[in-house]
Swiss-Prot record:
Mg(2+) 1 binds at residues 437, 538. This is DNA topoisomerase 2. Transmembrane segments: none annotated. Signal peptide: none annotated. Induction: Expressed in the early phase of the viral replicative cycle. Its EC number is 5.6.2.2. Residues 706-1173 form the Topo IIA-type catalytic domain. ATP binds at residues 64, 95, 142-149. Keywords: ATP-binding, DNA-binding, Early protein, Host cytoplasm, Isomerase, Magnesium, Metal-binding, Nucleotide-binding, Topoisomerase. Binds two Mg(2+) per subunit. The magnesium ions form salt bridges with both the protein and the DNA. Can also accept other divalent metal cations, such as Mn(2+) or Ca(2+).
């Protein structure tokens, strides 16, 4: 009886949850797939407007029944069935189990002044009910005891029947509670409760009686609620609708009912969400989730405490947890930082069913169907099983990736620098798209196409379109992620950078390409807007090796069938034209190998002019007209052979180890047979292009980024040094950086832009603590950067100047070596050496760091004293360490120290295990609560260091302020600590064997870890394991230089002695020979030959320069007698003869010295090397003492 106590109406009415919803209709639409009793699929549409108050009438009676089922769940007499029926507008709900107590209610009887029983109070009196005041662990769905009364108020009639095991109670309520008839009470052993009623439909916006459509719509909705209740109560209680059991006794069955029509054959993931504390732990939530691309937004059905809950914190908790997992998995899978997934994206393909009980919740909203509970309840107490989240996440990410792939196919961009062909439509297959490398190439294409009017046999805009590739193409192979879904399907996902790339997306739009089409059939290819694409690129490494290779890789990645069917072509323009004197038609060569083979067959090229055309812009108007006149013969088609797939993967894929193995060897040049085959078939196999042009570009890129181990220089720095030796040879006056850069670009054929060249020149002159070069090539005049910003604060190339550090450079790189080195030839002219071999191993004497094609290059300069000691021990047989070092080299072991350089470094170097570490220094002032940093670790710029500390939140928690008073030479950084921080720092940043607490706190230590990857002399990469290995590999190269230098000098001296001796002899015999009496030079030469004078190549002997010993020996004695016949009268005088005799004596003395040096031990020229080592050391000492000004 206490459960039905009548409460104060005023307090009761204040609750927002007293409101039951609007009396007007709202639209309820949807389509559900459901099971009938025999499991035949049936679709029940709900598409009419309905009144929320009417639906609430039905729903409240159903919820009362499920509440009763839950209340009796632990009792002896349980609820075994709930029967729901709806026929001709009459709604009924019945359940067994204990009925409403049939007893007189004293308080209500006193108020009504008649006998009132508890069933009447429960159904007809607004101030009484079991749900008015609920405990915190209550799981009832009813609220405030209003539901049954609301049903009675809106009913024409109602019949309440209940039996409590002793009596049966039947009462009729008519005219919306206006007439409450006395109950009929009879003895009965039954236990059940049944409520049957006829709502006042007309007042709620319906026909009275209901129309057939209204009856069907309401019946479908009630049936749905019955199925939901079946899932809620579970298998212990049967739910009937119109006497048929509902077969949705589990959360999975309910999920199938909702999704079988809309998403058939979808996997349903199920789990139980459990809590860790009472009362929540007593009631786990059952969850079933369906993931399907057919769902376009997140939807859920939530049956909580028997109520069809439209929203609540439990749903938010589930969504957020899934989203966190999806975002993490998505980023790990796609590896694209620019692609983001939102909560909406991650949950848009999910349909979730949640069934269960949650204690202590409140119901809000007009229809009391919005769950309200403190949000932290779920975060604190509930957890979702990881296996469920993992499976869900995998399915969701697969769908997201598929949707991204489809969306990206329709990405539209503005296409710049595109001119379409005039023809199109039915003639599209006859059109070609000319893709020019850049603006200058586009100008050539435009010039060629506009010649169409005067050149009928050539191409024109009628059937040709043109587009610019913008001078660069993105490597698409590294911008996709291949993902295998659970179903085994492989999805290629393009990242955001690729889909937003204007150049490649522009090609897709212009050609009409579809990423979802393979173009295997002619019908598919006929849909394209052009019949082919023709690449028009420069004949240099950037054009052929890089841009054309990337374009081919793009088509091979997405549409290999187009390459197979000849869709991708190139305009092969002449690389070299040779103009013979007196002829107007040049000989054209498309590959250097062709030119080399032709040149070898010529007796001389003296009467030929050789012109290189590495850039398309080099062709003049006449040459363009000639090329486009024979345009068809210059268009070559790419073919796709079996090995191309692997090579595309090697050169453009993400597996750097494969590429590194391939690039360890040099390029194998095209053979004459291969070039002939290319021209005869006008076809270029992709594999051949990749193995020659692309590989050459990759190796060239490596040589621009990673130094050669012989000289420690990249190609750019080598060009700068060679240019400096040439430019400053006669006059070492200072020159502006930009002026010197122009000289290098002109004389050393630098093709990568003024900005990068000027930057390299500035770096070569930088000399400050922490700079890359401890031994600068140039003397910088002006501001060349400081330690503060790591050299980035250098002045403009227009304002700062350089001059050669000649005293150091000329000792480190002896001029005599220049004739022995192999050289790079650009445009047929000699440029810089392929490598230098300096007197000391410069590769381990300076700092450096750079990545290239999967390799990392990192070196830490070694101590000059150690290097000098090692090299001298190797060279000098009298050195006490000489034999020991040679023993170590033979066995590849280390015996002498080779420590990191500490020059210009005021910190400390320590070794732990196999690595050295550099340490900064500091001073602690406990009184001022300040730490003063007086040195930073090696090669750490000041500003970068301070920024790294400020980004560390756990360090800044102790720091009040950082003040930088450092100069370019010294470090003075004041770290002001917060009060009482010093002891806390010592506690939190523990001291270890390797560093103390302050060093740890201020990050005053770095590891000198090295990646000793260098370019080999003949190309490719060599990986060293130690600095000793580099030294040991370098030593034989430098040693051989001296033998080659001496042998060459010996050959030259011998030839010059022969020539000078012959001239002296001729002077002595000139009177007898009397050559002036002969009519011509030929007759005179005959006489000299008969008298045993040797014919000599005077120019070669006088200026041997780059001639090798073999050339000297072969060509020097195959000359003529010009060296004698060109002698003037004054050269026949006795004084002149005397000078020549003295010259011969000096040359003979030098020759004897050279012969002696060649016989030296331990190798020829060892003493010369020692002398040059001494000279380099003196230059370095002087340079360091004068800040490399040498004055």
């Amino acid at each position: 009886m206490e459960a039905f106590e009548i409460s104060d109406f005023k307090e009761h009415a204040k609750k927002k949850s007293m409101w039951a919803g609007a009396l007007n209709k709202v639209t309820i639409s949807g389509l559900m797939g459901v099971f009938t009793e025999d499991e035949d699929l049936m679709a029940l549409p709900i598409h009419r407007d309905h009144c929320p108050a009417l639906l609430k009438i039905f729903d409240e009676l159903i919820v009362n029944a499920t509440d009763h089922e839950r209340a009796c769940h632990s009792k002896t007499k349980k609820v075994t069935y709930i029967k729901i029926s709806f026929d001709k507008g009459v709604f009924a709900c019945e359940n067994d189990g204990p009925g409403i107590p049939i007893a007189k209610h004293e308080q209500a009887s006193l108020i009504a002044k008649r006998d009132v029983y508890v069933p009447e109070v429960a159904s007809c009196h607004f101030l009484a009910g079991t749900n008015i005041n609920k405990a915190k662990d209550c799981i009832k769905g009813g609220t405030n005891g209003v539901g049954l009364k609301l049903a009675m108020v809106h009913s024409q009639w109602a019949i309440l029947t209940t039996a409590d095991g002793a009596q049966k109670y039947v009462q009729h309520i008519n005219q919306r509670l206006d007439i409450i008839e006395p109950p009929t009470i009879t003895p009965s052993r039954e236990m059940f409760t049944r409520i049957e009623l006829m709502p006042v439909y007309q007042e709620l916006g319906y026909a009275q009686p209901l129309s057939e459509t209204e009856q069907a719509d309401l019946s479908a909705w009630i049936y749905l609620r019955a199925c939901q209740c079946a899932a809620y109560v579970g298998k212990g209680t049967t739910i009937y609708y119109n006497d048929k059991p509902c077969n949705t006794g589990s959360v999975m069955a309910l999920a199938k009912m909702y999704t079988l029509l809309s998403a058939p054959n979808s996997t349903i993931h199920t789990t139980a969400i459990k809590a860790d504390a009472k009362p929540y732990s007593l009631h786990p939530l059952q969850v079933a989730a369906v993931v399907s691309p057919k769902f376009k937004k997140f939807e859920h059905v939530s049956i909580i405490n028997g109520v069809n809950c439209v929203k609540g914190e439990h749903v938010t908790f589930l969504k957020k947890t899934i989203n966190e997992m999806v975002v993490k998995k998505f980023q790990q899978t796609i590896k694209d930082k620019n692609r983001k997934t939102t909560l909406r994206d991650s949950c848009s393909n999910i349909f979730v069913v949640i069934v269960g009980s949650i204690p202590g919740i409140e119901w809000t909203g007009q229809r009391k169907d919005e769950l309200s509970i403190a949000e932290n309840v779920f975060k604190t107490h509930y957890s979702i099983p990881s296996s469920f989240l993992t499976n869900m996440t995998r399915s969701i990410v697969d769908i997201l990736l598929q949707s991204i792939s489809k969306k990206d196919n329709h990405k539209q961009v503005d296409v710049d620098k595109y001119t379409r062909a005039n023809a199109g439509g039915k003639k599209a297959q006859d059109c070609m798209l000319l893709a020019a490398e850049g603006d200058s190439a586009l100008s050539l294409v435009r010039a060629g196409l506009t010649l169409g009017k005067s050149n009928p046999s050539g191409p024109s805009f009628d059937f040709c379109g043109m587009i610019s590739l913008g001078g660069v193409i993105m490597n698409a192979c590294k911008k996709v992620t291949n993902i295998t879904t659970d179903s085994g399907e492989t999805i290629m996902v393009r990242n955001e950078q690729l889909t937003n790339n204007k150049v490649l997306q522009g090609i897709v739009q212009v050609l009409g390409l579809d990423f979802n089409c393979h173009y295997k059939t002619q019908e598919e290819r006929a849909k394209l807007r052009y019949g082919c694409i023709v690449a028009c690129v420069d004949q240099d490494l950037d054009g052929c090796g890089k841009i054309l290779g990337l374009l081919l890789a793009y088509f091979h990645l997405f549409w290999p069938q187009l390459i197979i069917h000849g869709f991708v072509k190139r305009l092969l323009t002449p690389l070299i034209r040779v103009y013979e004197k007196g002829k107007t038609v040049p000989v054209e060569f498309y590959y250097e190998q062709e030119f080399d083979a032709w040149a070898k067959k010529q007796t001389s090229l003296a009467n030929h002019t050789v012109k290189y055309y590495k850039g398309l812009a080099a062709h003049d108007t006449h040459e363009v007209k000639s090329m486009f006149k024979h345009f068809d013969n210059m268009v070559y088609t790419f073919t796709l052979d079996d090995s191309a797939k692997e090579l595309f993967h090697i050169y453009f894929g993400g597996e750097s180890e494969l590429r590194k193995r391939e690039l360890c060897t040099g390029v194998v040049p095209l053979t004459e047979t291969q070039t002939q085959s290319i021209h005869s078939d006008r076809q270029i196999p992709c594999s051949l292009h990749l193995q020659v042009d692309t590989k050459a570009y990759k190796l060239d890129a490596i040589e621009r980024q990673i130094p050669n181990f012989l000289d420690g220089m990249t190609r750019a720095r080598r060009k700068i040094l060679a240019g400096g030796l040439k430019c400053f040879a006669s006059n070492n006056r200072e020159r502006k950086v930009f002026q010197f850069g122009g000289y290098v670009a002109d004389h050393m054929f630098y093709h990568h832009g003024d900005m990068s060249l000027n930057t390299s020149i500035i770096k070569a002159a930088q000399y400050y603590p922490g700079s890359s070069h401890l031994y600068p090539v140039f003397i910088g005049i002006g501001s060349f950067g400081s330690r503060h910003l790591g050299g980035k604060d250098a002045g403009s190339p227009r304002y700062i100047s350089v001059q050669l550090a000649s005293e150091f450079i000329k000792t480190m790189f002896p001029a005599e070596d220049s004739w022995l080195l192999p050289y790079v030839f650009e445009d047929g002219q000699r440029a810089e050496p392929e490598y230098y071999v300096p007197v000391l191993p410069l590769a381990i004497m300076e700092y450096g760091a750079n990545p290239s094609e999967g390799w990392k290059y990192t070196t830490w300069a070694r101590q000059l004293e150690d290097i000098l000691a090692l090299v001298r021990a190797y060279v000098d047989k009298n050195n006490p360490k000489h034999e020991l070092l040679h023993y170590a080299i033979e066995r590849k072991i280390t015996v002498l120290p080779l420590r990191p350089s500490n020059y210009n470094f005021k910190g400390h170097l320590k070794r732990f295990g196999q690595y050295y570490y550099s340490y900064g220094t500091y001073v602690v002032s406990e009184q001022r609560n300040i730490i003063t940093i007086t040195e930073l670790p090696l090669r750490v710029p000041t500003v970068a260091y301070i920024e790294s500390i400020k980004k560390s939140s756990n360090r800044m928690a102790f720091i009040e302020e950082i003040i930088d008073y450092s100069s370019s030479e010294t470090i003075e950084i004041l770290v002001k600590l917060k009060p009482n921080s010093l002891n806390r720092i010592v506690e939190e940043f523990k001291e270890t064997e390797e560093q103390d607490s302050i060093e740890n706190f201020l990050r005053l230590r770095n590891c000198l870890h090295s990646h000793l990857n260098f370019v080999k002399p003949k190309g490719g990469i060599i990986e060293f394991n130690s600095y000793y290995e580099i030294l040991y590999a370098w030593l034989p190269y430098r040693r051989d230089v001296y033998q080659k230098r001496l042998m060459r000098e010996r050959a030259v001296l011998k030839l010059r002695i022969i020539m000078e001796t012959a001239i002296v002899r001729y002077i002595n015999e000139s009177a007898d020979l009397n050559l002036s009496h002969y009519e011509d030079e030929k007759e005179a030469s005959r006489i000299l030959s008969e008298h045993g004078f040797p014919p000599l190549n005077q120019s070669l002997i006088t200026s041997p320069e780059f001639a090798s010993i073999e050339e000297l020996n072969q060509k020097a004695l195959q000359g003529c007698y010009t060296y004698i016949l060109s002698l003037q009268a004054r050269e026949l005088l006795i004084a002149a003869k005397t000078r020549r005799v003295e010259k011969i004596k000096k040359m003979q003395a030098r020759l004897d010295k050279v012969e002696q040096l060649l016989q030296e031990s331990p190798f020829p020229g060892a003493s010369v090397w020692l002398e040059e080592i001494d000279a380099v050391e003196k230059a370095i000492i002087k340079g360091r003492s004068t800040q490399w000004k040498f004055h």
